[in-house]
């Protein structure tokens, strides 16, 4: 009698389905990777709601390009900036400041092979008629005051392109006692063109980068926000 009862109980235990065993490591990964949990009714509860943490709503800040025509003044100033920047980047008049062998590649830019005139780039001999200065070559200590004087005579807005390794940081003559280790110690530089000497294509690419910088200049908008 007792043996039959034990046999029936063991058969009942074997017939009962066992619960699914979830590894501890897998359960931890699932709780970390999931950003929301479901309650008993099936609704999605935000993470941290069970701990009583209030979730703050994210506030989207519109970019200047997404403002559209909400403000008439802002729209007018943005349009005016686009027109002025287009006119400036389409008529660059560089002030030639050739100091060494990099000036040969700068002169090569004006030849028919590249024809810089088709882009509105015309070399000027007077700093008062220029808006871009191309420092091409090695800048010595004796030439530094002249560079600064020519830069001060240029009207605003003005930009500077440092052409070549010598103008960027001294280059081959970096440890010489008579060489300025970079023309950015004398005048503020906007575009650096590497190379010894850089090719005319590299200088042309530097001019394109300067035009890109001009397109993103906020002239009247910065004045209006002051």
Curated annotation (Swiss-Prot):
Note whether Iron occurs among the keywords: yes
Query: Region (Disordered): which ranges?
Result: 40-68
Report the subcellular localization.
Mitochondrion
EC numbers on record: 7.1.1.2
The record's catalysed reaction(s) read: a ubiquinone + NADH + 5 H(+)(in) = a ubiquinol + NAD(+) + 4 H(+)(out)
Cofactor entry:
[4Fe-4S] cluster
Q: How is the cofactor bound?
A: Binds 1 [4Fe-4S] cluster.
Q: Look up the domain of life of the source.
A: Eukaryota
**GO molecular-function term, one example from the UniProt record:** 4 iron, 4 sulfur cluster binding
One Pfam assignment: Oxidored_q6
Q: Which NCBIfam families match?
A: nuoB_fam (TIGR01957), PRK06411.1 (NF005012)
Give the family from UniProt: Belongs to the complex I 20 kDa subunit family.
Relate the assembly described in the record: Complex I is composed of about 40 different subunits. This is a component of the iron-sulfur (IP) fragment of the enzyme.
Job description of the protein? Core subunit of the mitochondrial membrane respiratory chain NADH dehydrogenase (Complex I) that is believed to belong to the minimal assembly required for catalysis. Complex I functions in the transfer of electrons from NADH to the respiratory chain. The immediate electron acceptor for the enzyme is believed to be ubiquinone.
- Please state what the protein is called: NADH-ubiquinone oxidoreductase 19.3 kDa subunit, mitochondrial
What species is this protein from? Answer: Neurospora crassa (strain ATCC 24698 / 74-OR23-1A / CBS 708.71 / DSM 1257 / FGSC 987)
């Amino acid at each position: 009698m007792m043996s039959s009862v034990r046999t029936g109980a063991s058969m009942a235990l074997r017939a009962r389905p066992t619960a699914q065993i979830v590894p501890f490591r897998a359960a931890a990964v699932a709780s970390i990777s999931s950003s929301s949990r479901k309650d008993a009714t099936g609704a999605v509860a935000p993470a941290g709601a069970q701990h009583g943490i209030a979730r703050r709503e994210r506030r989207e800040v519109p970019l200047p390009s997404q403002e559209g025509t909400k403000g008439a003044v802002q729209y007018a100033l943005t349009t005016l900036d686009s027109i002025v920047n287009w006119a400036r980047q389409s008529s660059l008049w560089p002030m030639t400041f050739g100091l060494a062998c990099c000036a040969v590649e700068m002169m090569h830019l004006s030849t028919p092979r590249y024809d810089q005139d088709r882009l509105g780039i015309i070399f000027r001999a007077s700093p008062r008629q220029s808006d871009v200065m191309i420092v091409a070559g090695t800048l010595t200590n004796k030439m530094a005051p002249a560079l600064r004087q020519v830069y001060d005579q240029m009207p605003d807005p003005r930009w500077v392109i440092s052409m070549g390794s010598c103008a960027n940081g001294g280059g081959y003559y970096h440890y010489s006692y008579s060489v300025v280790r970079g023309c950015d110690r004398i005048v503020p530089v906007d575009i650096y063109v590497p190379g010894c000497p850089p090719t005319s294509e590299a200088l042309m690419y530097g001019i394109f980068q300067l035009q890109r910088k001009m397109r993103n200049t906020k002239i009247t908008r910065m004045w209006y926000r002051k």
